[in-house]
C-alpha cells in the first residue's frame, strides 16, 4: 500500500513552521496514542504513521530530501538517506506533554517534588499625595500558607509520609512506548517520592491552608500607576518543602480633583477673569506643597502655559523633581448686572475699527475674507 504524503498525514501545509508541525503531531499523538485506544489497530497504525511523518519533517535535512524526492528521498530501502530511528525529532519533549495530559500532572516537577509557591498580585489604590510623598500602608492578602498542624507535610500529626510504591521514592517513572522511552514525573506522588497514607485533618493532606495575611507595605516616594513593589516570600507557600512565592503590589493612583500627572510633571488648569487676562495681575495657585504666587502678564490668552519649576514629582528612581504646568483658562463673565453690561458695551464700541487689540481675531477674519474672495 502506498504511503500517504507526510504533510497530509499531519494535516499541515508544505510550508508549515516547526511550531506548526509540532502542534499538529502532538494533536494526533494525543488522539491516537495506544494508551487512549487499547486494542484499536487502526489507531495504532495512525499513531505510527504520525510518528514517521513527524520524524522526517522535524529534521531539516530529511525534510529537504523529502520535499525534493518524496518518500524515495528518506527511505533507505529505496536509496534515500533516512533511517529507522528518531534522530532528528525531540519526542521526549513532546511526549512529556502528552503523558502529563494523560495523568493530569505537569512536567515541571523536579526530583524530590519540592515546588515553589505561586506569586500573588495585589492592587494598591493610592491618592496622588500618597504616591508623590510615599507612605506605609497595611493590607490583607488572601493566600495559602503552610499548615501549622502538620508543619506543611500533609500527614497527620505523629505520622510521616511513606515512600511511593509506584516510583520507589525517586519521583520519576520511565515509560516505554514502542521505539522510545520517556522519563516522566510520577503520576501517583507527583514527583515528591512520598505518599500520605494518613492525611492531616486540617489541610486534608495538602500541606497548605487558606488564610489572609496582614502585611505592612512601604511605598517609596514618586511611584506611579503600574509600578510594582515586590515582597519576597510573601506569596503562596510552596509544596513539599519548596520556597514560597512572591507578592507583587501593583500601584494604581486615583484621579486627582486638581492635578493631572504625566510622569514627573503635573498639570493644572487655572481659571482667570478676562480683566486679569487683559490687564495682568497676580493670583495664588495650588501645589502639592501649598499655595504659591503666579504672576499673570497683561494680554494673556487662554491655553497659555506657565511653568513652576521643581513643583512636580521627584522620580522614584532618583533625579530632579518635575515641574507644575499651569494652563490658563480665561473665563467669560456671566450674570452681568445693568451697569456691567453698559461698561462692556462701551468697551466693545471703543474697540471697533482698531484691530491691534485682538491680533488673532484680526488675522482670522482676514483669512476668512481671503477664503471667500472678499479681498
Swiss-Prot record:
Domain of life: Bacteria
SMART domains: DnaJ
GO terms, biological process: chaperone cofactor-dependent protein refolding; DNA replication; protein refolding; response to heat
SUPFAM superfamilies: Chaperone J-domain, DnaJ/Hsp40 cysteine-rich domain, HSP40/DnaJ peptide-binding domain
InterPro entries: DnaJ, DnaJ_C, DnaJ_domain, DnaJ_domain_CS, HSP40/DnaJ_pept-bd, HSP_DnaJ_Cys-rich_dom, HSP_DnaJ_Cys-rich_dom_sf, J_dom_sf
Gene (UniProt): dnaJ
Record-annotated J domain positions: 5-70
CXXCXGXG motif-type repeats, residues: 147-154, 164-171, 186-193, 200-207
Record keyword Metal-binding present: yes
PROSITE patterns according to UniProt: DNAJ_1, DNAJ_2, ZF_CR
Record text on subunit structure and interactions: Homodimer.
Binding locations of Zn(2+) 2: 164, 167, 186, 189
Function field: Participates actively in the response to hyperosmotic and heat shock by preventing the aggregation of stress-denatured proteins and by disaggregating proteins, also in an autonomous, DnaK-independent fashion. Unfolded proteins bind initially to DnaJ; upon interaction with the DnaJ-bound protein, DnaK hydrolyzes its bound ATP, resulting in the formation of a stable complex. GrpE releases ADP from DnaK; ATP binding to DnaK triggers the release of the substrate protein, thus completing the reaction cycle.
Species this protein is from: Ectopseudomonas mendocina (strain ymp)
Essential cofactor(s): Zn(2+)
Protein's name in the database: Chaperone protein DnaJ
Gene Ontology molecular-function annotations: ATP binding; heat shock protein binding; unfolded protein binding; zinc ion binding
Pfam families per record: DnaJ (PF00226), DnaJ_C (PF01556), DnaJ_CXXCXGXG (PF00684)
Major subcellular site: cytoplasm
GO cellular component: cytoplasm
HAMAP family given in the database record: DnaJ (MF_01152)
